[in-house]
C-alpha cells in the first residue's frame, strides 16, 4: 500500500500502513510527528461534545483530539456545523442525534410539505387553480408556499437546483434516432410550453433547457413515445415533467369515465391522467417534490404513494384529488387491488430508472400495471422511458411498452462525466477508516456522500465518524421512511454534511452541492459505480469521486479501467497490474453480466445497430424475458445453459422473477426497502 497510495503527504506507521485508531484520537496528516499543543478550552461557537466523548476542555491522548485546532478546523467547514446543530445524544440513547439508528435527527418539525407521521406528503401548494369554460385559470400567488417550494433567492442552498449550468454545454453530443424526429428547442418559451409552466420554471431558477430537455420537450409535446438515455444529473425529471404538465395545462382534465358515476366520499376511486413509476421511495418523493413546484397554482394535483409509509394518509391524499400520480410499483398494485385507483384515464406513462426497476425484480408488477389492469393500450397512450443506462435487453423489452418511439441518447451515457474527477486509491480493508479520515480532513467544504455495501457497515461507519467529531448520519433500508427523510433533509441543507449510504440512495436522488462521493466499498457492477459517482458533478457542476480499491474488487477492474479512459481520467498502474493478474487467473466481472454483451449496447439504439438476441448466448433455446416468466429458471429460462440473471432460481435470486410475489419484489429475506 505504501508504494501505491499518494494521499497528499499521508505518513504511514512503521508497519507500512496506518491502522484503525484503537482508542487514540485521530491525528491529521500535517500534524503527525509534532508535539501536541497545550490544553485549550472550547472556543465560542465550537462543535458540541458528540457521542459521549471527552469534555471539550480535555485534550485527547495525543494532545490534539479536542484542541483549539480541532475547533478551528470545524469552523472552516461549509455551513459552520457548530452554530445551529443540537447536541448529539450519545450511543446510549439511540433515539436521536445524527447517527442514531432509532430516530435519525432528533429535532422536530416537518419539511418539504411532508406530513408529520411518516406518511405521504400533502399536495399543499399545488392544485389551487381551476379549469373553467375550457381555460386554465391559475390560482393566487402564495408567498409562503413559494418560499417553501422555490426558496427565497436563486442562491438559497436548501432549494437551489442543479440544471442551471448548461449554458456552456451546448456542444454535448446528442443522438436522436427514429422517424420524423422534431427539432430541439433552445429556450423555455411559449410555444411549445404553456405560459403558466414557463412562469413556474422561472420561479425555480431554471435558465435554459438541459440537452435532454431540449429534445424531450418537442418529442413529448408532439405526441411521440420516447426512450431517453441521459447522464445522471442531466435534467431527466424535468425532461418528462415539463411537457406532461404543459399539455395538461393546455388541454385540461379528462372526463371521468361513465362507470365512475355515483362514487362519493371516502371510497371513491381516483382516475389520474399521468402515471410515473420509479423504483425507490426516495426517488418517487423527489419526483413528487419537483412536480409540486411546476404544478404550483395550477389545476393539477400531484400525489405520491410508496411502501413503508402509512397507507391511510396516502389514501386521504388521493381522495383530495389525484391528477398526476408518482408511485412505486408495489404500493400501486396494492392500491389497485383495494379499488382506490383506476388507470382508465392514463394519457402518459413514465418509467423512470427503468433498468433498475427490472434489475430489482419489478417486472411482474410493471407488466401487471401496464398490461393486466385497465390502462389504455399502447396505441392510446404516450409512454416514456428514462434512465441513465439502457442495455440492449431493456431496449428489447421496450418493444412491448412503446410504439414507434424515438431513442434519445445525450452525452456519453452509460459512462461517467468529465466534470467528475475520479480517483482510485489502493486501500486494504483494514486501512479504509484511516484513509477516509485523511480525505475528510483534506476536503473540508461541501457535502460528502460515502457508499458502503451493507446496512451494518453504514451504521458502524457513521458511528465511527461521529466519534471522530464528524457530524455524520446513515441511510439504509432498515431505517423508517421518516428517519430516512430526515437524514436526507439535514444532509441537503448542510447541517449534517456527511452521509453514509447503501445502494438505497445510489440511484436517482438529486442532492445539489455534493462535492465528493467516496466509494468506501466498491459495488460488484460497474453500472452501479456510474450511478453512485453521478451524485456529484451534476448538471455541469464539478465534483470529486474517490474509490477504495483492492484485490477484492478485481471483478470490475477491466470495466473500471475502460470508464476511466473514456472520461479522460488517470488510470493507476496498480489497476493495470491487477487486470493482468486477473487475465491469468480467469477472473472477470463479478456482478451481473447484462447478457454478456458488456456496455457496448447501453447507449445506442439497437434498431439502428442490430439487435440479434439479448447479447451473448443468454437467449439460446427460446429463453429471454417473455417466456421465463416465473418458472424458476431465471432470466434466460435455460438459455445459454445458465441459470439466468439472478444467478440462482430466478430474476430476484429467489423463486421465479419476483420470488415473493407482488409483496416483496426481491423474494423472501431480501430487503423490502426498495418498494
From Swiss-Prot:
Comp. bias intervals (Gly residues): 96-120, 584-601
EC class (word): hydrolase
Biased composition (Polar residues): 69-89
Residue stretches making up the Helicase C-terminal domain: 419-579
EC numbers for this chain: 3.6.4.13
Family: Belongs to the DEAD box helicase family. DDX3/DED1 subfamily.
Motif (Q motif): 186-214
Nucleotide-binding found in the keyword field: yes
Binding site for ATP: 230-237
Protein name: ATP-dependent RNA helicase DED1
Amino acid at each position: 500500500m505504501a508504494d501505491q497510495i499518494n494521499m497528499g503527504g499521508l505518513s504511514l506507521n512503521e508497519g507500512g500502513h496506518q491502522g484503525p485508531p484503537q482508542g487514540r484520537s485521530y491525528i491529521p496528516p500535517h500534524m503527525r510527528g509534532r508535539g501536541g499543543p497545550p490544553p485549550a478550552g472550547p472556543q465560542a461557537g465550537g462543535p458540541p461534545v458528540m457521542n459521549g466523548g471527552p469534555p471539550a476542555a480535555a485534550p485527547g491522548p495525543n494532545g490534539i483530539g479536542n484542541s483549539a485546532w480541532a475547533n478551528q478546523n470545524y469552523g472552516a467547514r461549509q455551513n459552520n456545523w457548530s452554530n445551529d446543530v443540537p447536541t448529539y445524544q450519545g450511543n446510549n440513547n439511540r433515539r436521536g442525534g445524527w447517527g442514531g439508528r432509532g430516530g435519525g435527527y432528533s429535532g422536530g418539525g416537518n419539511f418539504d410539505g411532508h406530513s408529520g407521521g411518516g406518511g405521504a406528503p400533502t399536495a399543499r401548494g399545488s392544485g389551487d387553480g381551476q379549469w373553467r369554460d375550457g381555460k386554465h385559470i391559475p390560482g393566487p400567488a402564495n408567498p409562503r408556499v413559494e418560499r417553501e417550494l422555490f426558496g427565497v433567492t436563486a442562491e438559497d442552498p436548501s432549494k437551489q437546483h442543479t440544471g442551471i449550468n448548461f449554458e456552456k454545454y451546448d456542444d454535448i453530443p446528442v443522438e436522436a434516432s427514429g422517424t420524423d424526429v422534431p427539432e430541439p428547442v433552445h429556450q423555455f418559451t411559449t410555444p411549445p410550453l404553456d405560459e403558466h409552466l414557463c412562469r413556474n420554471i422561472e420561479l425555480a431558477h431554471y435558465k435554459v433547457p438541459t440537452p435532454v430537455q431540449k429534445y424531450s420537450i418537442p418529442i413529448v409535446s408532439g405526441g411521440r413515445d420516447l426512450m431517453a438515455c441521459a447522464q445522471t444529473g442531466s435534467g431527466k425529471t424535468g425532461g418528462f415533467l415539463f411537457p406532461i404538465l404543459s399539455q395538461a395545462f393546455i388541454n385540461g382534465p379528462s372526463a371521468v369515465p361513465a362507470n365512475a358515476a355515483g362514487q362519493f366520499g371516502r371510497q371513491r376511486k381516483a382516475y389520474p391522467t399521468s402515471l410515473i413509476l420509479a423504483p425507490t421511495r426516495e426517488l418517487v418523493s423527489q419526483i413528487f417534490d419537483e412536480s409540486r413546484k411546476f404544478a404550483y397554482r395550477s389545476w393539477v394535483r400531484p400525489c405520491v404513494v410508496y411502501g413503508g409509509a402509512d397507507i391511510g394518509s396516502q389514501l386521504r391524499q388521493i381522495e383530495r384529488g389525484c391528477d398526476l400520480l408518482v408511485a412505486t410499483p408495489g404500493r400501486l398494485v396494492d392500491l389497485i387491488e383495494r379499488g382506490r385507483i383506476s388507470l382508465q384515464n392514463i394519457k402518459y406513462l413514465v418509467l423512470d430508472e427503468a433498468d433498475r426497476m427490472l434489475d430489482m425484480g419489478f417486472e411482474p408488477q410493471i407488466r401487471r400495471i401496464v398490461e393486466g389492469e385497465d390502462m389504455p393500450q399502447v396505441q392510446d397512450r404516450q409512454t416514456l422511458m428514462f434512465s441513465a443506462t439502457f442495455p440492449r435487453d431493456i431496449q428489447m423489452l421496450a418493444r412491448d411498452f412503446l410504439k414507434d418511439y424515438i431513442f434519445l441518447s445525450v452525452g456519453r451515457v452509460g459512462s461517467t462525466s468529465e466534470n467528475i474527477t475520479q480517483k482510485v486509491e489502493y486501500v486494504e480493508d483494514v486501512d479504509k477508516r484511516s484513509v477516509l479520515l485523511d480525505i475528510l480532513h483534506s476536503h473540508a467544504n461541501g457535502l460528502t456522500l460515502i457508499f458502503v455495501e451493507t446496512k451494518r457497515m453504514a451504521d458502524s461507519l457513521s458511528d465511527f465518524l461521529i466519534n471522530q467529531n464528524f457530524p455524520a448520519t446513515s441511510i439504509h433500508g432498515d431505517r423508517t421512511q421518516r428517519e430516512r427523510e430526515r437524514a436526507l433533509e439535514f444532509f441537503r441543507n448542510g447541517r449534517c454534511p456527511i452521509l453514509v449510504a447503501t445502494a438505497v440512495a445510489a440511484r436517482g436522488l438529486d442532492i445539489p452541492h455534493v462535492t465528493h462521493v467516496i466509494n468506501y466499498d466498491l459495488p460488484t457492477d460497474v453500472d452501479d459505480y456510474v450511478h453512485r459517482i453521478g451524485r456529484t458533478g451534476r448538471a455541469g457542476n464539478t465534483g470529486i469521486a474517490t474509490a477504495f480499491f483492492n484485490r477484492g474488487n478485481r471483478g470490475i477492474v477491466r470495466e473500471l479501467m475502460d470508464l476511466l479512459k473514456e472520461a479522460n481520467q488517470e488510470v493507476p498502474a496498480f489497476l493495470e497490474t491487477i487486470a493482468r493478474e486477473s487475465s491469468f487467473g480467469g477472473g472477470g466481472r463479478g456482478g451481473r453480466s447484462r447478457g454478456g454483451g458488456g456496455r457496448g449496447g447501453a447507449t445506442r439504439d439497437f434498431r439502428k445497430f442490430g439487435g440479434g438476441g439479448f447479447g451473448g448466448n443468454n437467449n439460446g433455446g427460446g429463453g429471454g424475458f417473455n417466456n421465463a416468466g416465473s418458472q424458476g429458471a431465471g432470466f434466460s429460462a435455460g438459455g445459454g445453459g445458465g441459470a439466468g440473471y439472478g444467478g440462482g432460481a430466478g430474476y430476484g435470486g429467489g423463486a421465479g422473477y419476483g420470488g415473493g410475489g407482488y409483496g416483496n419484489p426481491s423474494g423472501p429475506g431480501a430487503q423490502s426497502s426498495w418498494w
